[in-house]
C-alpha cells in the first residue's frame, strides 16, 4: 500500500493550485473526476467570470491565461435587473470572461509530473486509522488503496470529505441551473437578476463565444419550475432565448452564518467551496479557492505541531471577508433596500440614448 504526505480529493481551481504549489516539496497524490483533456466527462456548470481577486492570485503566482481559456467578448459592466421594481442599472465590473471547463483543464495541466494525478477517477471511501488517512478510489478500471498523512477535501459543494468530517453539519444549498442559447442580442452583455418571487438568491446571464448563457440559483425542491418562470418574465426586459442548445445543473453552497465555514480536523483539511468558501453575494468561488489553497500550502510547508489549528487561524481574514459577503447578500436580496439603492443611481453608469439596446422593461425608471 503506497503512502503519501498529502492526498487531494478534487482538482478544481483549489485542488489544482495546491497540488502545483506542493509539487517537489511533499509527496502528493491527487484524484479528479474530470478527464485530462477534451469535453467528455464531468464539467463544472459555471458562468465563467474571473473576478479581480482571482486575477490578483495569478499575478502573485506569475501566471498568465492562455488564449484558449479566454472567451469572447470581454465585458466591463453588469446590468443589474430588479424584476419586481422594473429597474435596470449598469455597474462597472472588471471580470475576465473565460471558458470554465478549459480553465479547469489548464489549471490541472500546470501540475508538475512529480504529483501523482489520477484523472477520470472516483473516490469511493475514506477513513482514519493508525494516524493515517486511508483512501480507496477507482481509476483506470480498478480500485486502489492508499494512505496519507494529510487529507485535503477540494471536492466542492457536495464534498465527500466535508460530509465525513462533519456528518451533522447543515449549510444552505441551492440548485444552480443554466441553459445555453445561440446569441441573438445585438450587443453582448452580462446581467445579474433579482426576483424575490423566484429565489432569495439571484440569477445571471452572460454572452460567451456566440452563446447566451442564462442561469440562476434556486430552491432545491422546485428549481426547474422557478427557472422556467423567470425565463418567461425576462421577455419584458428584452432577453432573447430561442431553443436551448445545452442545459446544466449542479448544487451550489450558500453560506449564511459564521458556522458555515468549516476548515477540517484530524489532519484533514477543506479548501475552496468544500470549506464553504464562496461569496454569498455573487456565488463567486474561484478567488477564494485560490486563496485558501495558498494559505494551506504555507501551513503545510511550515509543518506546525497543530496543523488544523494553524490553518483555522490563517483563514481568519478570509472568513471575515466572506462573512462580509453574507451581510452584503442580505442587503442585495432585501427588496426595499435594493430598490432604494438602485433608484438612488449610486455607481450607475447611464448608457447613451442611441445605444442599440437598453434591456429594460417599458415601465423602467432610468
Swiss-Prot record:
GO molecular function: FAD binding
A Pfam short name: FAD_binding_3
InterPro entries: FAD-bd, FAD/NAD-bd_sf, Geranylgeranyl_reductase
Family listed: Belongs to the CbrA family.
PANTHER family xref list: CONDITIONED MEDIUM FACTOR RECEPTOR 1, GERANYLGERANYL DIPHOSPHATE REDUCTASE
Protein name in the entry: Protein CbrA
Lineage, broadest ranks: Bacteria, Pseudomonadati, Pseudomonadota, Gammaproteobacteria, Enterobacterales
Gene: cbrA
Amino acid at each position: 500500500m503506497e503512502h503519501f504526505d498529502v492526498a487531494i480529493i478534487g482538482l478544481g481551481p483549489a485542488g489544482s493550485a495546491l497540488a502545483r504549489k506542493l509539487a517537489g516539496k511533499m509527496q502528493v497524490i491527487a484524484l479528479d473526476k474530470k478527464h485530462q483533456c477534451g469535453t467528455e466527462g464531468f464539467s463544472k456548470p459555471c458562468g465563467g467570470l474571473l473576478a479581480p481577486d482571482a486575477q490578483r492570485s495569478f499575478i502573485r503566482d506569475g501566471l498568465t491565461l492562455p488564449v484558449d481559456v479566454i472567451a469572447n467578448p470581454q465585458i466591463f459592466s453588469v446590468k443589474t435587473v430588479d424584476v419586481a421594481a422594473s429597474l435596470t442599472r449598469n455597474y462597472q465590473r472588471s471580470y475576465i470572461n473565460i471558458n470554465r471547463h478549459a480553465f479547469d483543464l489548464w489549471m490541472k495541466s500546470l501540475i508538475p509530473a512529480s504529483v501523482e494525478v489520477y484523472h477520470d477517477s472516483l473516490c469511493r471511501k475514506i477513513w482514519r486509522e493508525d494516524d493515517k488517512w486511508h483512501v480507496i478510489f477507482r481509476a483506470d478500471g480498478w480500485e486502489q488503496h492508499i494512505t496519507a498523512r494529510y487529507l485535503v477535501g477540494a471536492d466542492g459543494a457536495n464534498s465527500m470529505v466535508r460530509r465525513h468530517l462533519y456528518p451533522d453539519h447543515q449549510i444552505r444549498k441551492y440548485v444552480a441551473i443554466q441553459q445555453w442559447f445561440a446569441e441573438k442580442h445585438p450587443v453582448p452583455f452580462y446581467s445579474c437578476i433579482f426576483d424575490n418571487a423566484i429565489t432569495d438568491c439571484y440569477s445571471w446571464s452572460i454572452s460567451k463565444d456566440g452563446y447566451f448563457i442564462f442561469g440562476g440559483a434556486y430552491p432545491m425542491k422546485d428549481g426547474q419550475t422557478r427557472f422556467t418562470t423567470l425565463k418567461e418574465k425576462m421577455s419584458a426586459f428584452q432577453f432573447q432565448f430561442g431553443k436551448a442548445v445545452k442545459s446544466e445543473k449542479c448544487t451550489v453552497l450558500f453560506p449564511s452564518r459564521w458556522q458555515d465555514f468549516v476548515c477540517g480536523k484530524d489532519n484533514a483539511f477543506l479548501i475552496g467551496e468544500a470549506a464553504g468558501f464562496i461569496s454569498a453575494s455573487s456565488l463567486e468561488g474561484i478567488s477564494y479557492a485560490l486563496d485558501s489553497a495558498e494559505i494551506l500550502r504555507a501551513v503545510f510547508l511550515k509543518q506546525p505541531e497543530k496543523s488544523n489549528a494553524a490553518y483555522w487561524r490563517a483563514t481568519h481574514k478570509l472568513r471575515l471577508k466572506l462573512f462580509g459577503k453574507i451581510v452584503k447578500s442580505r442587503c442585495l436580496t432585501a427588496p426595499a433596500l435594493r430598490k432604494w439603492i438602485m433608484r438612488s443611481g449610486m455607481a450607475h453608469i447611464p448608457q447613451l440614448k442611441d445605444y442599440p439596446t437598453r434591456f429594460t422593461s417599458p415601465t423602467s425608471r432610468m
